[in-house]
Amino acid sequence: MSRSLKKGPFVDHHLLAKVEKAVAIKDKKPVKTWSRRSTILPEFIGVTIAVHNGKQHVPVYVTDQMVGHKLGEFALTRTFKGHPADKKAKR
């Protein structure tokens, strides 16, 4: 179920302040955040945000097609190592 339009998109205040500061001084360093739940706003376009995936910060360069999605969608938390090999096929 999507969020109500009258509420508007959710963005953590500390993340919004960091991004606005980075845009104002044209800083190219990634903005570090643990806020995977924040929605990407048009103000974030062109900024690199380092999103925490539980182990490390994954750099995410925000483009116009990402607006409206959550930051956590672009920093995967699970690594797929592949299915175990079939023991019958090895014989």
From Swiss-Prot:
GO terms for biological process: ribosomal small subunit assembly; translation. This is Small ribosomal subunit protein uS19. The keyword Ion transport does not apply. Keywords: Ribonucleoprotein, Ribosomal protein, RNA-binding, rRNA-binding. It holds the Pfam family Ribosomal_S19. It comes from Leptothrix cholodnii (strain ATCC 51168 / LMG 8142 / SP-6). Protein S19 forms a complex with S13 that binds strongly to the 16S ribosomal RNA. GO terms for cellular component: cytoplasm; small ribosomal subunit. One of its GO terms (molecular function) is rRNA binding. Belongs to the universal ribosomal protein uS19 family. It comes from the Bacteria. The keyword RNA-binding applies. NCBIfam families: rpsS_bact (TIGR01050).
